[in-house]
Amino acid sequence: DYGQKNPTVFEAFGVDYSRQALRGLDEWYHCGRDEGQKSPSEYAKELKDFCDRLEKEYDRVVSWVFIDPSAAGLIEEVRRIMPHIEVIPAFNDVKLGISRVQKFFSFRRILINRNQKQLIRELGLYQYDPESIKKGKEEVLKVNDHAADATRYLVCGMWGLIAVFLPVSDRE
């Protein structure tokens, strides 16, 4: 998930075919409001360094990066400095994405690593706006949601490959 004043978060997951699950690997987090803003090219360099470290640590190649579709400048910078990785603008249907992530948690098909501290923190805070619920709508509160959004982008982006980890009736 990308932000200038709001946090920029990279959530890394691997596909564990033997357990039919997404396995959390690590996280990178920077809040522009607290730590100073960075340019898209600086974030692209941070992402490259993060992916290089993951590849070395896990002896696996990073294949895909899903980036907030509103971050066109970052997408272009990442494509420029990481041409070997498929950079995909994230699917951003919030309601469907939340439903898919919930299914993965319900069926224990997503495993979080203790290094994913912001994701762990945010999952306990992620909520719908009580006022919107009173009006018969479910609108997500857009606070404390950056790591969770990054995870939602991943689940939706990989859905065609990972939906098979769920019971047939829950694959939609």
Where on the chain are the PLM-derived regions?
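Short, intrinsically disordered, charge-balanced linker/junction segments flanking boundaries
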Residues: 1, 169-171
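Mg2+-dependent endonuclease catalytic cores in nucleic-acid-processing enzymes, primarily RNase H-like
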Residues: 11, 18-142, 159-165, 172
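Gly/Thr-rich phosphate-binding beta-strand-loop-beta motif of the actin/hexokinase/Hsp70
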Residues: 1-15
